[in-house]
Amino acid sequence: MADIKTILRETSVATIVGLKKEEIEYTIEELYNPSLFLQYAKQVISGELGSLNDSLDSINSFSNEEINIINNGNKLADVIFQKFQIDKEDTITWEGNNVGKEDPIDIQIGKFGFSLKEDSFILENMGLYQLINSFTGSSYKTRHIFKDYAYKEYSEWFSKTWGELVSYLNNYNGEWRLDNSKGSSSILFVNSNNDIKLSYTKNNSTRECVLPKQCSLPVFEKETTSDLRGKVFSKFINQNLKKNEIYEAAKKKCAKVATEALAKELKENLNYSDFLPRFLRIHKMEYYYAKTTNANVEIYRVPSLKEFVNEIEIESIESHVPKSQANILTTIINKHTGRKLVLRNECRFSHGQFNGTPEAKMYYENNGSLLVIYQDVVNS
């Protein structure tokens, strides 16, 4: 069940629009009483209100924050009622109570659907395969930005990194050590056989492996565990190679080749009819995203799946590698308004360099939002 703030954000708008269309006299102060709020909601909202009833049944008063949500709901309801010319024939349902549905609509007022959740347009923390599937309609289960798109350069990056590690040990008496204040120890050292041992100790438990001085990427991946890669090898890189020119040059070369290959794949296989619309919060039916603050009310029209291809397109997909960070920049444009949104996917390891599969975390460039590419209905 959603929290009380989310429920109030949705049902306050639905209730007040309903009171207005039914011409029921009320004061905003009456809605500050949970019992009266519930009574009014039951009068004007059709369908199931179980979550609202459960949420309000056990409280005697609203907090100041909850009262502010109701006040903002009142402002938004007034705009919706007037702008969309709501009349008595329009049925109001609270769709936010339906946890099984796929679309983002929270309240339905006649033929108009509204999404009111504050997190309706949050960014994505996705695996690379999810990004590719969203853009192309592919069905990958996993994808590695470096191994799958620039394996030769990825192997070279590892070799350069390993070479710098060996050079460090040769220059510092054959050992590197990092002790954590919580009692863990990460150690690299040259053993009696002139091989390199990786060791990680925590809570009196030690994990270790031995690697040859001439170590390849396949051998490294086969012989090491996630702990040894993340807690030893990656810690060494962070502490000693962040400004190393050889390391950074190899990493940048790999990032550039990989992102150029990925951008090419995305552009050549772009599929507007599959997962991409859902990725952009486009669904079968047109709906409106609405939000209100103490300062203003904003309502945006989100096109239907059928209208989508005529209104919104991906203008470009490009490789972008500042310093050595592997990025994909996607520019989306509304063809009617000319407004553009740039999305940045940062392809990076989340648990240390060369450890696991990199993610493709998505960010908006220049403080953007998906709302930029939708049509303004109200912004006051």
Region locations from a protein language model:
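Short, positively charged
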Residues: 1-104, 108-109, 113-380
